[in-house]
């Protein structure tokens, strides 16, 4: 959440807009606020769970898509999805998780924030303010016997080390 009285520090937040229309879907709004010389600047993203695209609809060339599917369906290993803001990392990750999500597969995610809620997935939102860091979450995951772990961000060496251990 955000503290609206704090205008000196960058902040992240989220709200859900409830669609009251018949058959409407709720929309999550994620936002980031930064202080600038001329006042606060905000960037907002609108997210709908129904917008999780299938893997074959996200624009990966077919040859590369086959390699990606083979990698995410592998029982071991690590797949890194990298790129600048707005390049499709989140879209790719969620499409990949959706592709392999089956009731018998234990999938755990560590995210900041959880951008789309997915049925059957153990999603945990990191919260460094209370000590719930990516490395803390990953250590807990290792005791949950997951087949798949998604880490939204790798911010430090400790998280790298645990992620590599989990991938082996």
Residues covered by each model-derived region:
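N-terminal "pre-motor" subdomain/linker immediately upstream of P-loop NTPase catalytic cores
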Residues: 1-87
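Switch/coupling sub-region of P-loop NTPases
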Residues: 69-79, 90-168
């Amino acid at each position: 959440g955000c503290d609206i009285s704090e205008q000196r520090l960058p902040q992240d937040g989220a709200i859900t807009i409830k669609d009251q229309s018949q058959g409407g879907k709720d929309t999550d709004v994620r936002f980031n606020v930064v202080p600038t010389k001329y006042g606060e600047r905000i960037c907002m993203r609108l997210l709908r769970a129904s917008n999780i695209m299938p893997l074959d609809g996200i624009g990966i060339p077919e040859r590369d898509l086959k390699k990606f599917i083979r990698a995410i369906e592998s029982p071991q290993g690590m797949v890194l999805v990298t790129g600048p803001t707005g390049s499709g990392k989140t879209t790719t990750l969620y499409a990949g998780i959706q592709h392999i999500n089956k009731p018998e597969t234990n999938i755990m995610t560590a995210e900041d924030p959880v951008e789309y809620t997915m049925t059957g997935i153990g999603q945990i939102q990191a919260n460094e303010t209370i000590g719930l860091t990516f490395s803390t979450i990953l250590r807990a995951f290792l005791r949950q016997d997951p087949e798949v772990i998604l880490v939204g961000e790798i911010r430090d060496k400790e998280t790298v080390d645990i992620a590599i251990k989990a991938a082996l």
